[in-house]
């Protein structure tokens, strides 16, 4: 009787598993994903199928679009769920001039200046600060909406590397836990410039090894003995000015930027030059590190380092349209620290 019961149970399990395609099981295994109930798995599978259909439909015309999409670890989330978890839309239309906006806040006075492009410098056709030794490895913010911390830290890592001639990984967790008095709130979308001000006033930022990332906010555990870099000021880019952004990137190093990343094409981006004409230039939702620019197949692009791990995009990076009237707001709210 026990043997018969066991055989029946095995058949039931086989039938249940057969309801899902092998691609679904492979995707779950690849990303180590499981669900608390069968109901939740069925619901997530429906979303996954819809996303896969969207990706397949786009890729039929990828040559016309100029970029390719791919299923990834965000595949069981709708675009709305993805945006809610990983980003937060903020309207920067009211900011006007970024420098003036920051200086209206007393904590920034005496610490902020606007970038002025050198009059006699000829900019290179291509810039990639990875080859210039100013970019650390691709990191992963996991399920914490703190792209601001990764962008701020990435820009500081770049400035420190260019000053010292070597890279050192700095602590996003230090920013996450300790910049709250400056207006940031852990895993909520906040401001890279608040993070810069924290580093300036605090006398530095710890290294990753002394203050590891845990993807959630805790109490501040900064140790002066663990400091890996300091900062003295903030340089802003004139809002919306891609030419100034290009010059700053080429002459000063990596820049922290905000973009409108709320589109499904960004969620599932794999490679190519992302071109989203209906992107917002003022309602921005995600911070990244701008590390380069160039041209491929006559398409001008910006090269950015994301914080969603090396399996997203081009090994963790993305190329976005350059010289397209500030597409996706890449030059709307851009800044970098000075040492």
Swiss-Prot record:
In-chain residues carrying the UniProt-annotated modification Phosphotyrosine: 219
UniProt modified residues of type Phosphoserine: 188, 335
Entries under Pfam families matching the protein: Inhibitor_I29 (PF08246), Peptidase_C1 (PF00112)
Signal peptide residue numbers: 1-18
GO biological process: proteolysis
Residues with PTM N-methylleucine: 123
Keywords assigned: Hydrolase, Methylation, Phosphoprotein, Protease, Signal, Thiol protease
GO MF annotation terms: cysteine-type peptidase activity
Propeptide residue range(s): 19-122
Catalytic machinery residues: 286, 306
Family: Belongs to the peptidase C1 family.
Protein name per the record: Silicatein
Natural source organism: Petrosia ficiformis (Common Mediterranean sponge)
């Amino acid at each position: 009787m026990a043997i018969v019961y066991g055989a029946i149970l095995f058949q039931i399990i086989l039938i249940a598993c057969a309801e899902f395609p092998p691609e679904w099981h492979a995707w779950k295994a690849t990303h180590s994903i499981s669900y608390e109930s069968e109901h939740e798995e069925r619901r997530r599978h429906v979303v996954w199928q819809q996303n896969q259909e969207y990706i397949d439909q786009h890729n039929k015309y990828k040559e016309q679009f100029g970029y390719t999409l791919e299923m990834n670890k965000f595949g069981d989330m709708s675009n709305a769920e993805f945006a809610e978890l990983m980003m937060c839309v903020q309207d920067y239309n009211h900011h006007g001039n970024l420098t003036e906006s920051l200086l209206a806040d007393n904590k920034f006075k005496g610490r902020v200046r606007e970038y002025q492009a050198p009059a006699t410098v000829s900019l290179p056709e291509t810039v990639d600060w990875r080859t210039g030794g100013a970019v650390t490895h691709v990191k992963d913010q996991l399920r914490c909406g703190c792209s601001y911390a990764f962008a701020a830290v990435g820009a500081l890592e770049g400035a420190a590397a260019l000053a010292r001639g070597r890279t050192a990984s700095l602590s996003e967790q230090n920013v996450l836990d300790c910049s709250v008095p400056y207006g940031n709130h852990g895993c909520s979308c906040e401001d890279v410039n608040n993070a810069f001000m924290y580093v300036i006033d605090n006398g530095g930022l710890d290294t990753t090894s002394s203050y590891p990332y845990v993807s959630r906010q805790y109490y501040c555990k900064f140790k002066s003995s663990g400091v890996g870099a300091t900062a003295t000021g903030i340089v802003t880019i004139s809002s919306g000015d891609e030419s100034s952004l290009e010059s700053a990137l080429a002459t000063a190093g990596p820049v922290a930027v905000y973009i409108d990343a709320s589109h499904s094409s960004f969620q599932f981006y794999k490679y190519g030059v992302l071109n989203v004409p209906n992107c917002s230039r003022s309602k921005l939702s995600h911070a990244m590190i701008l590390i380069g620019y160039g041209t491929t197949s006559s398409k001008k692009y910006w090269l950015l380092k994301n914080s969603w791990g090396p399996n997203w995009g081009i090994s963790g990076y993305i190329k976005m349209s350059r010289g397209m009237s500030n597409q996706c707001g890449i030059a709307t709210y851009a800044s970098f620290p000075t040492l």
